[in-house]
Amino acid sequence: MGEKIRIAIAGYGNVGRGVKAAIEASSDMVLCGIVSRNPERVKKELGASDIMVMDINDIAGWTRELSPDLAILCGGSSTDLPVQGPKLAAHLSTVDSFDNHGEIPNYFNAMDKAAHDSGNVAVISTGWDPGIFSLERVLASSFIPGVKPYGFYGLSESGGLSMGHSDAIRRIPGVKDARQYTHAEPDAIAKVRSGGNPVLTAGEMHWRECFIVLEDSADAGAVEETVKNMPNYFAPYRTVVNFITQDELNIRFSGFPHGGCVIASGTTADGGSAQIEYQCNWGSNPAATASVLVAHARATMRLKKDGKSGAFTILDIPPAYFSNLSREELLKKFM
């Protein structure tokens, strides 16, 4: 693709760290800087690194100083991205992993206007779900007409760590730290695999388990009530809340495992049985999301080169745009 893509990381938590590692492992990209609400914390964490770190609120300053081709937005979906996304898309092209499924249409519209008005490209809501799983749902429903794709998450006994839901809990007043694990219901998976497109509610497909560390003065009952009634995140599900110490959280829940599957069962036009199933398992959820984000950064630049502007999702992007291989190489290696 010629010159290396210059990428700024906006927000430096677990996903931001994963994005940094993924950029450094990509031969066609370079990290030009990190922007954060707390640049001093990031500088301290990076130590003697020569990576430039600037205040995310000084948009004119860091876009001028860092000269990024695009920014990968690594903030949370509950409060960060709804505000930061449109604001930043008005200044440069962006990629993000906004994962509040119910709000994606509204977020898309806001990002589309901001990016289109400024001639930028904003790729939104990518990762593995939303993202890869979104694409798998469309493929399954297209290849097996009339089928209903189902998504299941947290297939292991310990469940899968949800970063977005954990972040949403941490934003509740009185919460010091938290982890949220999603568990798939095995009976629901069995029903889907048997065919017939069963009608299943969200609560019949998954349940949620929370491990929360409270501030000293926090009201445990109020926090639990807030969690269980949080729209989109917890309200539709059976949710178990556990209050533990910070030491226990650090020892027992320090990793970031997750995984899931998309299953679609039905019939072909001649009545033959048909089933499509896609599964992924990640040792680190943030590293997985970061890897997908970085591939979409490559696609963003190709869309920009094509003269495109506005918001896009994984559903709008040719798969070849994610790869750093040429068309000839892709045909030879993967076709």
Task: Report each predicted region and the residues it spans.
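NAD(P)-dependent Rossmann-like dehydrogenase/reductase catalytic/cofactor-binding core
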Residues: 270, 274-335
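Oxidoreductase and adenylate-handling cofactor-binding alpha/beta cores
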Residues: 132-149, 167-181, 299
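Rossmann-fold NAD(P)-binding glycine/threonine-rich loop
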Residues: 98-122
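Glycine-rich Rossmann-fold phosphate-binding loop(s) that bind the pyrophosphate
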Residues: 12
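C-terminal substrate-binding/catalytic lobe of Rossmann-fold NAD(P)-dependent oxidoreductases
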Residues: 6, 17-18, 25-31, 36-41, ...
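Rossmann-fold NAD(P) dinucleotide-binding segment
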Residues: 59-74, 78-97
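Short alpha-helices
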Residues: 116-144, 292-293
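Hydrophobic Val/Ile/Leu positions in short beta-strands of Rossmann-like dinucleotide-binding domains
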Residues: 7-9, 73
